[in-house]
Structures are given as structure tokens and as C-alpha cells.
Design a protein with these regions (language model features):
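Conserved N-terminal subdomain of the carbohydrate kinase-like
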Residues: 1-55, 59-69
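Short hydrophobic/aromatic-enriched beta-strand-loop microsegments
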Residues: 1-2, 70-73, 154-156
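Short, acidic/turn-prone active-site loops that include or flank metal/cofactor-
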Residues: 4-6, 75-77, 158-162
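Short, charged, surface-exposed secondary-structure boundary motifs
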Residues: 10-12, 79-84, 163-167
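Structured loop/turn residues at beta-strand edges in well-structured enzyme cores
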Residues: 41, 99, 130
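Conserved beta-alpha-beta core of the PfkB/ribokinase-like small-molecule kinase fold
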Residues: 45, 49-125
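Conserved phosphate-binding/catalytic region of the ribokinase-like
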Residues: 63, 88-91, 95, 120-175
Length: 175
């Protein structure tokens, strides 16, 4: 289903010497999703790959959680646009949304912003205590950690022959 928007989100990524760090500008911003424009979509699993904090409201998250398994990438929930610049935001009321999320994908920075923990196991346990059923934490070259039903599963990273651009690695993992 195509949901019309006045614009499509358009980012400019600016990288320095460290490919794991970037700054971003938003040159165009799409309209947020609403219950009305998502209401008739039926699926077993809904994945929210949000780009910015206001893409999906708490009401939309609650609504979709009643229709099927709800998966989300925390990335977009933790950044907002001021002017054209993308800025990290604190968890605000995002903890409220977590109890409706079945599967949550975060990276190391996102887990720390959400939980205050820099230890992946502590962060995963905290997210689960807040209601997330399955926590996926990407750890860059160290692979990833999955926490589900009280158990940890470590997945090693696959070393590439050459790193050209790290853009989209988290999105690819979530897919």
C-alpha cells in the first residue's frame, strides 16, 4: 500500500575519519504515519524502521501491537530534527512505547541512551523488564547479542574483505 506524503525523508550523511560516526542533515521530512493511513493494513508482523522520533506516535504503536507482532528499530525514535540538523534525544516517553514492542533492535549507543547502561547484558535485561520480549543489540565488529526468554545468544560478526561504507548496516541487520 502506498501512503501519500507531501515529501520523502531525505538525509545527507557526513562522515569523518571514523566510519562508525557521522553527522546528518535532513533536507526533507515526510509526514508521520497515522492510525487512519495504516488501519487497513493486515500482517502477522509489523516492523517500524522509523527514521525520526515523530514518524510513529505512541497511539500508532499501541494500535499496531494489537494487530500482530511488533518489531522496531530504536534508531529513529532517538533522533529529532532542529533546523536541518539531526540531534540525539533522550528517551523522553519512549519507555512507555517499549511495553508494546515485541522485538527491539538497538546499537550500543541507542541501548545506553535508553537504559543508561553501557553493558549490553545489563541493557538487554533492563529493556526486557520494561516489556520488550526480544532484544537485539548490534555491536559492530563484535557481532550482536540477542536476549529472549531470559537467555543470551551471541552472534559473531562476519568480517568483510573491505569496509567501504557502514551506512545501512543496522537496517540490514533488522531486515
Amino acid at each position: 500500500k502506498i501512503i501519500p506524503s507531501r515529501k520523502t525523508v531525505y538525509f545527507e550523511n557526513i562522515y569523518g575519519d571514523n566510519p562508525d560516526e557521522r553527522s546528518q542533515r535532513v533536507l526533507a521530512k515526510a509526514d508521520p504515519f497515522t492510525i487512519e493511513n495504516l488501519g487497513d493494513i493486515e500482517a502477522n508482523i509489523y516492523h517500524l524502521g522509523t527514521l525520526l522520533a515523530d514518524d510513529f506516535s505512541l497511539e500508532v504503536i499501541k494500535h499496531l501491537s494489537t494487530k500482530g507482532i511488533l518489531s522496531a528499530d530504536a534508531q529513529g525514535y532517538l533522533r529529532e530534527v532542529r533546523g536541518e540538523q539531526v540531534h540525539a534525544i533522550k528517551k523522553k516517553k519512549k519507555q512507555e512505547a517499549l511495553k508494546y514492542i515485541d522485538v527491539l533492535k538497538v546499537n550500543e549507543k541507542e541501548m545506553e541512551v535508553l537504559t543508561g547502561y553501557d553493558d549490553p547484558e545489563k541493557a538487554a535485561r533492563q529493556l526486557a523488564e520494561w516489556g520488550v520480549k526480544e532484544v537485539l543489540i548490534t555491536l559492530g565488529s563484535l557481532g550482536s547479542l540477542i536476549y529472549a526468554e531470559g537467555e543470551f545468544y551471541r552472534i559473531p560478526a562476519f568480517p568483510p574483505k573491505e569496509v567501504v561504507d557502514a551506512t545501512g548496516c543496522g537496517d540490514t541487520y533488522a531486515a
